[in-house]
Amino acid sequence: MKIWTSEHIFNHPWETVTQAAWRKYPNPMTPSIIGTDVVERRVVDGVLHTHRLVQSKWYFPKWTHALIGTAKTCFASERSTVDPERKQMVLKTNNLTFCRNISVDEVLYYEPHPSDASKTLLKQEATVTVFGVPLSHYMEDLLTSTISTNAGKGRQGLEWVIGLINTEVKGIARGTDELLHNTRRSIDEVTESARKSMDEISAQAAKAAKAMHIT
């Protein structure tokens, strides 16, 4: 059994990072993750519970095919909880494919940085166990190395999604500013038109009154 752990600090608040975590896949940094499907989602005592199925591609060396078999597509089960009051997001993932010989249990914790609330601390832990096949320790090292590499790509992917979200927010803000500007301009135009109409009516009334007085 191999245990891998890692910590990373995002220079973004917890709300932004967790929002990006839901939209993390697909992204160009982790093309091995094909997509996710929501199996179940419910809220219990203010905590969001979600069960998703993750579809991915794992590229094992050819020499492992005779030991564990082959699969073009791999599946994993992801169960998560999000507590907005305590600002905690926990994701637990375990593999479904190759589960007769391989067990990969991964846990991710997202929480505000203890000394800087404007940042988010990510803690990751993966437990890898290979059993029932030769060279199990070597395969555990191989899988652990792959997990470490993919974790780095995953963090890059999350930053990419955060950038996308920030761009969307700026676009919405810009659109709102344009809408307010156009609305103000329309109101000014209507006000000016009404003022001119009132001036014309007043002028015509004065002209008519003057004509009646002369007559």
Curated annotation (Swiss-Prot):
Annotated knockout phenotype: Flies have defects in locomotor behavior and die during larval development, due to abnormal neural function. Mutant males lacking functional slmo survive into adulthood and show an early division of the germline but never progress through the gonial divisions. Mutant females demonstrate germarial degeneration and reduced fertility.
InterPro entries named in the record: PRELI/MSF1_dom (IPR006797), Slowmo/Ups (IPR037365)
Occurrences of domain PRELI/MSF1 (ranges): 1-170
Coiled-coil segments on the chain, per record: none
Tissues showing expression: Expressed in specific tissues such as the developing central nervous system (CNS) and both the male and female germline. In the CNS, it is restricted in a subset of cells during embryogenesis and early larval development. In embryos, it is also expressed in salivary glands. In the testis, expressed in somatic cyst cells throughout the distal region where the mitotic cysts develop, extending through to meiotic cysts.
Family per record: Belongs to the slowmo family.
Cellular component annotations (GO), alphabetically ordered: mitochondrial intermembrane space; mitochondrion
Subcellular location: Mitochondrion
Gene, per the UniProt record: slmo
Annotated transmembrane regions: none
Known role: Required to regulate peristaltic movement and also for germline proliferation in males and females.
Protein name: Protein slowmo
GO molecular function: phosphatidic acid transfer activity
One BP term from GO: larval locomotory behavior
Keyword Mitochondrion: yes
Organism: Drosophila melanogaster (Fruit fly)
Record keyword Mitochondrion present: yes
Domain of life of the native organism: Eukaryota
UniProt KW keywords: Developmental protein, Differentiation, Mitochondrion, Oogenesis, Spermatogenesis
Pfam family, one: PRELI
Disulphide bonds in the chain: none
Principal location listed in the UniProt entry: mitochondrion
